[in-house]
């Protein structure tokens, strides 16, 4: 039986790089994959998964109203798929996570999801919440805090690198807006305000 995987990490841990490597491994063996990324992420061109080290691949952009089941099933009928890979999985909604589980269960296609576990306020994203709840396999991708400890938190900062405590859960950004920290330094930075 195919499995639903959730690979989670803080910012700058190499989630997209890992996804692109997994995609390459499948394709190198002549297997068909289908890649998705969040349409809300506009750091690069829409419908492109790009890693900080320069690797990239085309992907289907998903939105709040997207039916991943319909898209995957339609593609699978045309050309049998061997793996589905989802970048920015924290932006999935509950229904989409359950659609991905159905892809595993009914179509027997493994689904590999990569995303953040928590936001800048240490709150779960909707997609992450349901992936943590129903994924068959959970794996943490390690990142490093400036102190050398494991980074598990995402600190949002302003243009002067000052910590931000409040705001919308979703604000797209990279190294200019977020710093991956260990829990200790995350709390220290927030308490320094």
From Swiss-Prot:
Location of the protein in the cell: Cytoplasm
Pfam family, one: TK
Membrane listed as a keyword: no
Keywords recorded for this protein, A-Z: ATP-binding, Cytoplasm, DNA synthesis, Kinase, Metal-binding, Nucleotide-binding, Transferase, Zinc
Residues that, per the record, bind ATP: 9-16, 87-90
One function term, GO molecular function aspect: thymidine kinase activity
Subunit structure: Homotetramer.
Name used for this protein in its record: Thymidine kinase
Annotated source species: Zymomonas mobilis subsp. mobilis (strain ATCC 31821 / ZM4 / CP4)
């Amino acid at each position: 039986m195919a499995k639903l995987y959730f690979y989670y990490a803080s910012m700058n841990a190499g989630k997209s790089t890992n996804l692109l490597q997994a995609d390459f491994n499948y394709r190198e063996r002549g297997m068909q994959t289908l890649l998705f990324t969040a349409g809300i992420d506009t750091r690069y061109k829409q419908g492109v998964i790009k890693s900080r080290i320069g690797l990239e691949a085309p992907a289907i952009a998903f939105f709040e109203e997207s039916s991943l089941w319909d898209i995957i099933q339609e593609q699978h009928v045309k050309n049998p798929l061997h793996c589905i890979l989802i970048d920015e999985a924290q932006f999935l909604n509950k229904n989409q996570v359950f659609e991905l589980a159905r892809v595993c269960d009914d179509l027997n296609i493994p689904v590999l999801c990569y995303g953040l576990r928590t936001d800048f306020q240490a709150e779960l994203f909707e997609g992450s919440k349901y992936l943590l709840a129903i994924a068959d396999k959970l794996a943490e991708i390690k990142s490093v805090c400036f102190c050398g400890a494991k980074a598990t938190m995402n600190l949002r900062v302003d243009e002067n690198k000052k910590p931000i405590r409040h705001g919308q859960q979703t604000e797209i950004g990279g190294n200019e807006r977020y710093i991956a920290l260990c829990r200790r330094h995350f709390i220290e930075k927030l308490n320094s305000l």
